[in-house]
From Swiss-Prot:
It comes from Epstein-Barr virus (strain GD1). This is Replication and transcription activator. Keywords: Activator, DNA-binding, Early protein, Host nucleus, Host-virus interaction, Transcription, Transcription regulation, Viral latency, Viral reactivation from latency, Virion, Virion tegument. Signal peptide: none annotated. GO terms for molecular function: DNA binding.
Length: 605
């Protein structure tokens, strides 16, 4: 069977001599798989080591600051080609040489190294205050996505997946080279790329192909199998399709106990820009519609709002029956219990949607009972007529039992109304009754804290202060005040509202407008003060970290002549600074793409 030449054209920036050696090596490897030659006669393992060494030397000579990424991609492509040619043979012909047995372990090492460098490119850029260009960041994100998806399939054929990884890597290198020629890359970004994109360590990569007797690379299958059995193993992944006895071996790069990493502060930026993003939103949007919309930011908060106790029923089901009459006379009647349950569901569905205040009423008494005298003699509230006059001008619902934009709130049967939760106020004596005022449910003595954006001056204030500032004017407050109306006591009648004062009631959407206005004032006053304090050196804990070694490296590069060739040998002090970064072996396997995507513009790519 002829060698598969699909991936030979995907290598990055190789000389014709290296391409010729590479083609000869792949042909000899296929002949070994066909049992035309032996692995020891053509020295497959030693030639594989030399070709990987040539990839690294070529990347150091012509790859500039991102040569480590180029070398990693070329090595990954080379071992993927060997892997694809091996699995195309029959089982009895494959697995008789050292490279075929150790290929899954080497592939795991290379993919792990590729994921590490791409993760560090996104994670450590904010902590070092490095701005990633949009086109480079988008191309790097595609490379990271393909690499992470294929990390679950170490023992599978890479075929098309190999081509996707190499195509994404080629786009990254092309964008870097083009922007470097146009002078669009700063010296700080170049130093950051040289720090992040490290070269693979060939000694660790070929550790499974070293003979335990001689200490050199070997093609003896028995020595390789004996060495693999001594390596630590991991549990099989459920995503691995074709499992083998070497697919669970961990590379040595993941088992390093000696910490060589330099302390680099990891600070995910974006908290400072969160206020600006929130200020850009429309401040006049309806607070109620945003809360109940399916795609809004209050959608996850509706579960707690729907489970609030209804203002038309007591918190304890048996409290009213104990006061009004004999609770044991008809408590066992199943028909009456179903009627009460349906009435409670209907009352709870109507309560949070009414736009005008209503009087408190008791539930219908059971058959054979008499209504409570205290509730029967309660006079009609005088402020209901004023509310009806206002509702005639601006109707919201044609009928309270048929809302126009909200479905009825359903609740499972068997759950008592006195259940407690994290967002539910605990029942207390004299304050268990809640009222509905201007469409908002106000529970006494506790309320649900409204949403305030991070950084808002109301975010860390107490609940009464966050709901409304301390009034300093007269008793009748103007429109726009956030002070909630006084809640009447349970036994006292509510104060009357005249038609002249009905237009002075607060707007439920005014709270959002006030929050946006406060954020804008904070952006005009607080943010410039923070920038001035950071410039003077008076930094707080919320400010970016102080200038580190990378800024020192940038200052050193900028102080040199403009015609400095970065490919030439550097000065001793510059080499000392670079060694501090290149020894960093920080294996960060946590994906934080959101930091990189926040500055991307996919329309440019």
């Amino acid at each position: 069977m002829r060698p598969k030449k699909d991936g030979l054209e995907d290598f990055l920036r190789l000389t014709p001599e290296i391409k010729k050696q590479l083609g000869s090596l792949v042909s000899d490897y296929c002949n070994v798989l066909n049992k035309e030659f032996t692995a020891g006669s053509v020295e497959i393992t030693l030639r594989s080591y030399k070709i990987c060494k040539a990839f690294i030397n070529e990347a150091k000579a012509h790859g500039r600051e991102w040569g480590g990424l180029m070398a990693t991609l070329n090595i990954c492509n080379f071992w993927a080609i060997l892997r694809n040619n091996r699995v195309r043979r029959r089982a009895e012909n494959a697995g008789n040489d050292a490279c075929s047995i150790a290929c899954p372990i080497v592939m795991r090492y290379v993919l792990d190294h590729l994921i590490v460098v791409t993760d560090r490119f996104f994670i450590q850029a904010p902590s070092n205050r490095v701005m990633i260009p949009a086109t480079i960041g988008t191309a790097m994100y595609k490379l990271l996505k393909h690499s992470r998806v294929r990390a679950y399939t170490y023992s599978k054929v890479l075929g098309v997946d190999r081509a996707a990884i190499m195509a994404s890597g080629k786009q990254v290198v092309e964008h870097l080279n083009r922007m470097e020629k146009e002078g669009l890359l700063s010296s700080k970004f170049k130093a950051f790329c040289k720090w992040v994109f490290t070269y693979p360590v060939l000694e660790e990569m070929f550790q499974t192909m070293v003979s335990s007797k001689t200490g050199h690379l070997t093609d003896d299958v028995k020595d390789v199998r004996a060495l693999i059995k001594t390596l630590p193993r991991a549990s099989y992944s459920s995503h691995a399709g074709q499992r083998s006895y070497v697919s669970g071996v961990l590379p040595a790069c993941l088992l390093s106990t000696k910490s060589k990493a330099v302390e680099t502060p990891i600070l995910v930026s974006g908290a400072d820009r969160m206020d600006e993003e929130l200020m850009g939103n429309d401040g006049g949007a309806s607070h109620t519609e945003a809360r109940y919309s399916e795609s809004g930011q209050f959608h996850a908060f509706t579960d707690e709002l729907e489970s609030l106790p209804s203002p038309t029923m007591p918190l304890k089901p048996g409290a009213q029956s104990a006061d009004c009459g004999d609770s044991s006379s008809s408590s066992s009647d199943s028909g009456n219990s179903d009627t009460e349950q349906s009435e409670r569901e209907e009352a709870r569905a109507e309560a949070p949607r009414l736009r005008a205040p209503k009087s408190r009423r008791t539930s219908r008494p059971n058959r054979g009972q008499t209504p409570c005298p205290s509730n029967a003699e309660e006079p009609e509230q005088p402020w209901i007529a004023a509310v009806h006059q206002e509702s005639d001008e601006r109707p919201i619902f044609p009928h309270p039992s048929k809302p126009t934009f909200l479905p009825p709130v359903k609740r499972k049967k068997g759950l008592r109304d006195s259940r407690e939760g994290m967002f539910l106020p605990k029942p207390e004596a004299g304050s268990a009754i809640s009222d509905v005022f201007e469409g908002r449910e106000v529970c006494q003595p506790k309320r649900i804290r409204p949403f305030h954006p991070p950084g808002s001056p109301w975010a860390n204030r107490p609940l009464p202060a966050s709901l409304a500032p301390t009034p300093t004017g007269p008793v009748h407050e103007p429109v726009g005040s956030l002070t909630p109306a006084p809640v009447p006591k349970p036994l006292d009648p509510a104060p009357a509202v005249t038609p002249e004062a009905s237009h002075l009631l607060e707007d439920p959407d005014e709270e959002t407008s006030q929050a946006v206005k406060a954020l804008r004032e904070m952006a005009d006053t607080v943010i410039p003060q923070k920038e001035e304090a950071a410039i003077c050196g008076q930094m707080d804990l919320n400010h970016p970290p102080p200038r580190g070694h990378l800024d020192e490296l940038t200052t050193t590069l900028e102080s040199m002549t403009e015609d400095l060739n970065l490919d030439s040998p550097l000065t001793p002090e510059l080499n000392e600074i670079l060694d501090t970064f290149l020894n960093d072996e920080c294996l960060l396997h946590a994906m934080h793409i959101s930091t990189g995507l926040s500055i991307f513009d996919t329309s440019l790519f």
